[in-house]
Amino acid sequence: MSAIQASWPSGTECIAKYNFHGTAEQDLPFCKGDVLTIVAVTKDPNWYKAKNKVGREGIIPANYVQKREGVKAGTKLSLMPWFHGKITREQAERLLYPPETGLFLVRESTNYPGDYTLCVSCEGKVEHYRIMYHASKLSIDEEVYFENLMQLVEHYTTDADGLCTRLIKPKVMEGTVAAQDEFYRSGWALNMKELKLLQTIGKGEFGDVMLGDYRGNKVAVKCIKNDATAQAFLAEASVMTQLRHSNLVQLLGVIVEEKGGLYIVTEYMAKGSLVDYLRSRGRSVLGGDCLLKFSLDVCEAMEYLEGNNFVHRDLAARNVLVSEDNVAKVSDFGLTKEASSTQDTGKLPVKWTAPEALREKKFSTKSDVWSFGILLWEIYSFGRVPYPRIPLKDVVPRVEKGYKMDAPDGCPPAVYDVMKNCWHLDAATRPTFLQLREQLEHIRTHELHL
């Protein structure tokens, strides 16, 4: 560690670059890939006191570990940094200048819409190979077929197989970063050889969620095979690298396969989604203490997002998971963005989304607060669908006229007051998550929830 590097503060996460067996009793041995947490700086800047995942503490060498960083906001990650989209043949040739044998890019075909073109620099000139798209497969020679562009590029990187040269160096599209490189650089890349996929625990339109084993620990793995979908999920994974809180589902790492698969590995939440947990147990099992604790768990996660200028945009009981020891954690960061950005409202869940977000695409912490009020209603109704007996098309017009749902059966009046505060039509008059947490803690302290 050089003298100019600032020391890492307590709580910094590091990932081991090499094995360290330790030579003295106070050393903390570790294996390559282990995640360690800095406890304190020592007198010697080349060594830190750290602890491992089971809480054992000891001294570690700074040059054997790499600090884990969040992927920088605004970084445009790409699984296909060599893909340049709609550019012409002439533009491709300019991009591959000066000539360098094996330099390549892929573009959309101008002559054959729906097909692609592989452009390769070879001995001073550029060759253009049509990539035909037929029956959901891609091929250059109609002999070898590929599922996606990444598989095709990987194949011709290892073997020219009829091309003028094998593919050696990608011409990266300006402004993009290869996802694999960025996750590796920031300390979030995991090793596929150490991941065992055990069984499917959920299916989504994007792919499967599987129970896995990573280095002896149970993990949940989102497996995304389709390259376009995987590209969208990169945004979710990069948001998760920036967030750390005991009530947010924790990202453990990312695996990007050269063939196009993307695996997002997170902590395993044994008891599934909060909505299913509530529905399957009900009033006879879950008392007022338990419901208020879940409400506070979610509120603390949202207060953390609020403080870090992130808006979740899809807060609902289906997107909250429950751990083995009954801790509720917010998940599903697919729509989470920095507070300033806007988004298409095509797929938003109407019953959970604030009126101004549906009407004007205005998302803010205050629109998350509205959703939190709906989530509280879900908790206290034991997982009922909001706005019962109101047709979906009538929900927004009624809400915009000031309609608020009645309190769920048995809901304490103090908790119902909190819900109603979240549902002010004027976003500015809704409370912050900090204020909501204080209100819920007041309810707990004064036993107003029983």
UniProtKB/Swiss-Prot annotation:
What are the entry keywords?
Acetylation, Adaptive immunity, ATP-binding, Cell membrane, Cytoplasm, Immunity, Kinase, Magnesium, Manganese, Membrane, Metal-binding, Nucleotide-binding, Phosphoprotein, SH2 domain, SH3 domain, Transferase, Tyrosine-protein kinase
Judging by the UniProt lineage, the source's domain of life is: Eukaryota
Entry's InterPro entries? Csk-like_SH2 (IPR035027), Kinase-like_dom_sf (IPR011009), Non-receptor_tyrosine_kinases (IPR050198), Prot_kinase_dom (IPR000719), Protein_kinase_ATP_BS (IPR017441), Ser-Thr/Tyr_kinase_cat_dom (IPR001245), SH2 (IPR000980), SH2_dom_sf (IPR036860)
Where would I find the SH2 domain in this sequence? Answer: 82-171
- Report the catalytic activity: L-tyrosyl-[protein] + ATP = O-phospho-L-tyrosyl-[protein] + ADP + H(+)
Residues that, per the record, bind ATP: 201-209, 222
PROSITE patterns from the xrefs? PROTEIN_KINASE_ATP, PROTEIN_KINASE_DOM, PROTEIN_KINASE_TYR, SH2, SH3
GO terms assigned for molecular function: ATP binding; identical protein binding; metal ion binding; non-membrane spanning protein tyrosine kinase activity; proline-rich region binding; protein kinase A catalytic subunit binding; protein phosphatase binding; protein tyrosine kinase activity
GO CC terms on record? cell-cell junction; cytoplasm; plasma membrane
Chief localisation class: cytoplasm
| Residues annotated as transmembrane | none
Name the SMART domains for this protein: SH2, SH3, TyrKc
Q: What is this protein called?
A: Tyrosine-protein kinase CSK
Q: Provide the species name.
A: Rattus norvegicus (Rat)
Lineage from the top down?
Answer: Eukaryota, Metazoa, Chordata, Craniata, Vertebrata
Q: Gene symbol?
A: Csk
